[in-house]
Amino acid sequence: MSAIFEPEAKFLLWLEIELLAAEGWAQLGEVPSDAIPRLRRAKVDPARIDALEARVGHDLLAFLGAVSEPLGDDARYLHRGLTSSDVLDTALAVQLTRAADVLLRDLAGLHEVVRRRATAERDTLMVGRTHGMHAEPLSLGFVLAGWLDELGRARARVERAREEIRVGKLSGAVGTHATVDPRVEEFVCARLGLQVAPVSTQVIARDRHAAFLAALAVVAGSLDKFATDIRHWQSSEVAEVREPFGDEQKGSSAMPHKRNPVLSERICGLARTVRGYALVALEDQALWHERDISHSSAERIVFPDACMVLDYMLRLMTQVVDGLTVDRQRMHRNLLQGGGIVFSQRVLLALVEHGMDRDQAYRIVQRAAHRALDDGQQFREVIAQAPEVRERLTPEELSTLFDPAYYLRNVRVTYERVGLA
């Protein structure tokens, strides 16, 4: 990913756009055809470009000055009718399209690892949590199936963002093609694999760029959510999973026992930066009239950084999921913690099915559950003592309501929906 945004790679893109524009003009008879091979001998010298920029204070003019020096009279065929943003915005579109391709490969790799782990953990029972509290049983595989579904949407989201940003422009100072034949624009964009912006000003409208970084921020948010779950699962009181931890890795300078979920914490922290970069792109939409330059300084930071950070996050999350250690015994113990209160809804529904008013049934089950929690008793034993329950449910019927596997009876449908069956 970093290679896409290296200064030399950027300058090479600028040069290719300038050369293609000259070729386009040559096809129209406006530039001598025999000049094109000579122009193609142009090279980029980042050090020379930097030196010139320090003098002229304009990166594109410094670039043109540097590449023109060995070209002699042929240099006049470069930048014909163009404005700086014709080159800069079109090059940025190529860079972001390539960056999206890297991110899509990353997403495909993470998707495959999550798919494999979801398949393996389909029947691994654990407790589901809402508001941070025990709710009802589910399986780790079911949770991972949700991640898989979300990653599918992430891939589609990046694909849409890629398509929207895959747009170039060579339309001149305010976008009217007064100095650039539209056929030159079409030729250059086609050779670069870009669509032509239907309408542009001096720049490509920044709603496209805002949407691109917003898409990256949403993907980062998904990884943030996954990593947050892992962090809680690894907490000492829960201890259901563990991140990969190297043989020589250390968790604390003071406490040798520490095995912290630092990889997941890192992902959560980096997600905040990507969200911040997206906000910058949203702020950059409101340029003055046909263009000002307030967006430029910010974009030079946020686009390379956001792409590289998300690339790293995706590869790191792939490493975490692939190497995640699952403690199934601890999951089972946690599931039964609280004396079986996670089965309260099944008792409620059974009482209603046997003729009890729903609100009455709710209150009976609620009192029994809270008593079990407060007194450290087994919910199953407390609810069995309630006279209203004994009147309607036999001990055998009540016993069947405390089977964790019951909650997985329709997981197959979910797996089929996400393509796991």
Where are these regions (language model features)?
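Glycine-rich cofactor/substrate-binding loops
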Residues: 1-13, 17, 37, 41, ...
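Short amphipathic alpha-helical segments with heptad-repeat character
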Residues: 97-108, 115, 145-148, 152, ...
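Short, well-ordered beta-strand elements within core beta-sheets of diverse protein domains
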Residues: 142, 210-218, 346-354
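A structural signal for small-residue-enriched, beta-sheet-centric alpha/beta enzyme cores
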Residues: 84, 176, 191, 196-203, ...
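Hydrophobic/aromatic-lined pockets within catalytic cores
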Residues: 26, 30, 115, 119, ...
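A helix-coil-helix interface module used to build multimeric assemblies
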Residues: 1-171, 177, 181-187, 196, ...
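Acidic, glycine-rich loop-and-beta core segments that form the ion-binding/anion-interacting portion
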Residues: 185-278
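Conserved hydrophobic residue
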Residues: 31, 36, 238-239, 357
